[in-house]
Amino acid sequence: MRSGVIAQKVGMTRVFTETGEHIPVTVLKLGNCQVVGHRTTEKNGYVALQLGSGSRKTVYMPKAERGQFAVAKVEPKRKVAEFRVSEDSLIPVGAEILADHFVVGQFVDVTGTTVGKGFAGGMKRWNFGGLRATHGVSISHRSIGSTGGRQDPGKTWKNKKMPGHMGVDRVTTLNLRVVQTDVERGLILVEGAVPGSKGGWISVRDAVKKPLPKEAPKPGKFKVAGEQAAEAPAVQEGA
């Protein structure tokens, strides 16, 4: 099981195949995604990689966090996340994971925080049908109707779909296809929509419900500080 990466959502665009078909894609950018720590079975009870991405001013950072990045010899990161991996998929601390960690054509699972919509009614939040437009209905056309129950059970059950805050939920979208990668600019283009707003942090990992391509690098594609990574084409077409 390989590590995922931390990326930022840039926005959506489209790419064209050789046959003229256009594919809507979401552009994800790797902002110097580095390994900042290991989690081992002996010390932590599980095996994982701790990754960091982006940059952060140390003046606003707790002393304990500054020490953690100092030990790893990496610059302070704005976003930190853990990815469970197998023993043979550990990547050295300080290594930077590159965009061609994923290969064109493979499927990935992406996780992000959805756009906040504020307080929403039942029709917008849960796709309720609402009440009738006429025939005695006044003012309550968009209400949810009955919340269920009479004297027995005499209450509204927990988790009943009702109006309330909508959005800002942690959502995972499965099986998005990698269309292109740009190693020089650190870009990954995936087919379809990705949850979250522009600039939001996205976790990208190998799809759990699809087989991993044989050409996918193991334990991953990365470069260690002071070393040159293997040369790769700037853009790989996935027609």
Swiss-Prot record:
SUPFAM superfamilies from the UniProt entry: Translation proteins
GO biological process: translation
Keyword rRNA-binding attached: yes
InterPro entries according to UniProt: Ribosomal_uL3, Ribosomal_uL3_bac/org-type, Ribosomal_uL3_CS, Transl_B-barrel_sf
Paired cysteines (S-S): none
PTMs per UniProt: Methylated by PrmB.
Positions carrying N5-methylglutamine: 151
Subunit structure: Part of the 50S ribosomal subunit. Forms a cluster with proteins L14 and L19.
Function noted in UniProt: One of the primary rRNA binding proteins, it binds directly near the 3'-end of the 23S rRNA, where it nucleates assembly of the 50S subunit.
Official protein name in the record: Large ribosomal subunit protein uL3
